[in-house]
Amino acid sequence: FDPTNKKRHYERMKYTQRKKAILLLADGTIFEGKSIGRDGTAFGEICYNTGMTGYQEIFTDPSYFGQLMLATNAHIGNYGINEEEIESNSIKISGLICKNFSFNFSRVNAQDSLDNYFEKQNLMAISDIDTRAVVRYIRDKGAMNAIISTETDIDALKEKLNAVPNMKGLELASKVSTTESYYFGDEQATYKISALDLGI
């Protein structure tokens, strides 16, 4: 550790000052971890992704709108973010669950760290979770809603969780689509293809 490196010192400070957080499943099961991004509470149906790379594409994928994303990849954040790799105009997941979250990143064309990106997008995440154990659990028990939170009143969190609607049958396309027409590519091209944006 080099105390003269201000960037490293800042990242180390953020790592050591993380707050305790919990992952609460709809059946009452609790997993303990550390918070990333904003404090507070985030909720949604818990789902998981086993991809080894491409976390930024996953977080901005409209098909995951409103879900708590559990990443089974052991390291999240280690190559930062690049705005050219987003799948939509903003993060679409409601929160992130991961094992190891990296405040340091190493990539030539990275534009920022993932934790700074989360803070700008007002996203909450929880790390230090045994993600493989959670995947095995929800794979056996089935899809369910969940909450991640820095709050400590479990009974109050259970009440909030009970009020979260089931995603089955929810109309979500309008929340990730656009209200205006727009172009990809050359507007003067000879051949044109029309597409209905339900979350491109």
Short names for language-model regions:
Residues 13-200:
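N-terminal beta1-alpha1 cap of cysteine-dependent amidohydrolase-like domains
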